[in-house]
UniProtKB/Swiss-Prot annotation:
Pfam families listed in its UniProt record: SOR_SNZ
Name under which the protein is recorded: Pyridoxal 5'-phosphate synthase subunit PdxS
Highest taxon of the lineage: Bacteria
Amino acids binding D-glyceraldehyde 3-phosphate: R166
Chain positions recorded as D-ribose 5-phosphate binding sites: D25, G154, G215, G236, S237
Similarity comment text for this entry: Belongs to the PdxS/SNZ family.
Length: 295
């Protein structure tokens, strides 16, 4: 029997449906329902949010399938789940469970330091993190249907997400202004498919949606990332590590939608309680920097 896999066009189209929205990390059915009621376009099912993964240390793996199954049964919006970088079997298990997207994630401890997954071996679409155009292009070349900035997960500090989004947008503009004979050299330097760079030159954008993630903790943070060109945002620890998750969730969704309405964002930001406690990224040791995982 011939293996059936989803085409790039179909999988990228599925990801396009999340454009302009907020995707929230959840660890149980109750949180998933809060996210759905707040207006999240999808949820990411985990055993622990990134800040807890960071605090616990050790090896972080795919969540217990019971957690993922609980979330799948609790909501009608799409459910994502994380697999370790390069871990073919974790990804196949998640696909068999019926998740809507798989995140090949640097938040988990990489299983393979040489190879990322060949996403075209799967029917389910993949989302992958990137710090710059080179990383984004390589993941898209492997079949990723959605890109997100890596940021620095679990810190509540947006500085790295801003750095990654600004760098990616600047590099896209550079490629758009290159002559066609410069593209091959650029493709070689980035380790990216020439045809992908040609698409970027002709359209001025990636062929997939590009979300912001890593350190988004407030409505203003979400609006900032949209202002910088993100197609939507992932919020990991920022919601359920806040004082008032329901209120934070609704406020971040609304700020993402109305990111240029600054009076509205001011109102949304009132009386939310404390945001999650943040970490100064500059204090992290090299081994603690999740964004450096993958290539």
């Amino acid at each position: 029997m011939e293996k059936v896999v989803g085409t790039d066009r179909v999988k990228q189209g599925m990801a396009q449906m999340q454009k302009g929205g907020v995707i929230m990390d959840v660890i149980n059915a109750e949180q998933a329902k809060i996210a759905e009621e707040a207006g999240a376009v999808a949820v990411m099912a985990l055993e622990r949010v990134p800040s807890d993964i960071r605090a616990a240390g050790g090896v972080a793996r795919m969540a217990d399938p019971t957690v993922t199954e609980e979330v799948l049964n609790a909501v009608s919006i799409p459910v994502m789940a994380k697999a370790r970088i390069g871990h073919i079997v974790e990804a196949k298990v998640l696909e068999a469970m019926g998740v809507d997207y798989i995140d090949e994630s640097e938040v988990l401890t990489p299983a393979d330091e040489v190879y990322h997954l060949n996403k075209r071996d799967f029917t389910v679409p993949f989302v992958c993190g990137a710090r710059d155009l080179g990383e984004a292009a390589r993941r898209i070349g492997e079949g990723a249907s959605m890109i997100r900035t890596k940021g620095e997960p679990g810190t509540g500090n947006i500085v790295e997400a801003v750095r990654h989004m600004r760098k990616m947008q600047a590099q896209i503009k550079q490629v758009a202004h290159m002559s066609t004979d410069e593209l091959m050299t650029e493709a070689k330097q980035l380790g990216a498919p020439y045809e992908l760079l040609l698409h970027i030159k002709e359209t001025g954008q990636l062929p997939v949606v590009n979300f912001a993630a890593g350190g988004i903790a407030t409505p203003a943070d979400a609006a900032l990332m949209m202002h910088l060109g993100a197609d939507g945002v992932f919020v990991g620890s920022g919601i359920f590590k806040s004082d008032n998750p329901e209120k934070f969730a609704r406020a971040i969704v609304e700020a993402t939608t109305h990111y240029t309405d600054y009076e509205r964002i001011a109102e949304l930001s009132k009386n939310l309680g404390s945001a999650m406690k943040g970490i100064d990224v500059a204090t992290l040791a090299p081994a603690e920097r999740m964004q450096d995982r993958g290539w």
